[in-house]
Each structure stands twice: as C-alpha cells, then as structure tokens.
Amino acid sequence: MNKKIYLVRHGKIDTGKEKCYIGVTDLTLSKEGIVQAQKLKKFFQNIHIEKAYVSPLIRCVQTADIILENRNVERILMRELMEINLGQWEKKSFSYIKRFFPEQFKNRGENIATFVTPGGESFEQLRKRVIPVFEAIKENTKDNVLIVAHAGVNRVILSSILSISINDMFKINQDYGCVNEIFWNDELKKLQCKKIM
C-alpha cells in the first residue's frame, strides 16, 4: 500500500466566548477557519488526491471545497463521517451542563466511552459508525485519498490504528485544520499514522 490517507480536521468554527458542546450542530467556518483551510489548500497543492470523503456538515464541506478548489477531485459526502451526536447537550456550554446536570457531567467524565448524552450517542457508538466506513475507504481506493471530518471522528480512527482505548483517545491532539497521514508500514506489516500539520 503506497497510497496515503490524509485525515483532516475542518477549520475553526465560531462557538462564542464560552466553550460549548458542538457535535452535529451545523456551523460554518469562522474567518480564522477559512484562513486555516487556505493553508491546507497550499499544503495539498502538489499532492495527488484520487477522492475526497467528506462529512456533510458545512464546516467540513467548506474546508474540502477550499482545499480542492480548481481541482478535478470527486467529493463524496458521507453521513457516517459526521461528528458525534451530543443530543440535548448540543450548543450548551460546559459550565451550563456542569451546573444544571452535574451527575451527567460527572458520569460522562468518568465513562467517556459509553456515556450517551440524552438524545445523542456515545463515543463507542461513534466508533461503530465510523470504523467500518474507514475500513471500506482504505480497502477500496488505489491512490491517495482525503478525509475531511471532525475531532471525534478523527480520534476514533486514529485510536483504532494506534490500539488506544476510547477512554484515552483525548490524548490524541486534533487541532482545527490539522493533517494526519495514514500509511502502511511494510517493515512492521501494519497501518501507521503521524500528524504532519
């Protein structure tokens, strides 16, 4: 496998002054996010991309459109690549949840893999949604591919490759506009990854 999978997190979004839970809430890129996407475009300008698999949330679509502007690359929107659904916690600040739902807040912190937000999904459920799609992308492409997704989605993919538990996946840093390169190591006979931007 000489091909590479470039796993990208979308550019920055504007969530206001307070840190909020944002999963499937459909927010556009901020001005800073657009600048980050333009830097990604420059990074990828000389890298051949066969296809792009993109979360249908607008922040990912915008990021992919900027990266691939004026390039004849097929873009495939995949609902399975959407961010974790945080249900009733969507758009609520961390401080609000901690204040009004202290038991749930504590429970999520202690059981991050299995905790399901009311009306949402757990990271374990997210992994079950994302990994089969990632495996299909990996097996069914012959050349370099781009995946534009979200911090949660990227972490479940990377933690799966690195054999890291969901409980420890937040140790994997996924800044806005970051790039992870996934490749096959012939010597070790396994899939590897590294953050390159």
Regions of interest found by a model, annotated:
Residues 9-62, 117-130:
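Loop-to-helix element that buttresses phosphate recognition and phosphoryl-transfer chemistry
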Residues 45-48, 137-144:
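Glycine-rich phosphate-binding loop signature in dinucleotide/nucleotide-binding domains
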Residues 5, 141-152:
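Generic beta-sheet signal
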Residues 40-105:
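Phosphate-coordination/substrate-recognition cap region in phosphate-metabolizing enzymes
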Residues 106, 110-138:
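Internal catalytic-core helix/loop-beta-alpha segment
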Residues 1-3, 77, 84-99, 143, ...:
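Acidic, low-complexity terminal tails and accessory targeting/binding regions
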Residues 1-6, 51:
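Extreme N-terminal starter segment of soluble prokaryotic enzymes
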Residues 11, 55-57, 80, 148-152:
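Short, well-ordered beta-to-alpha junction loops that form the rim of enzyme active sites
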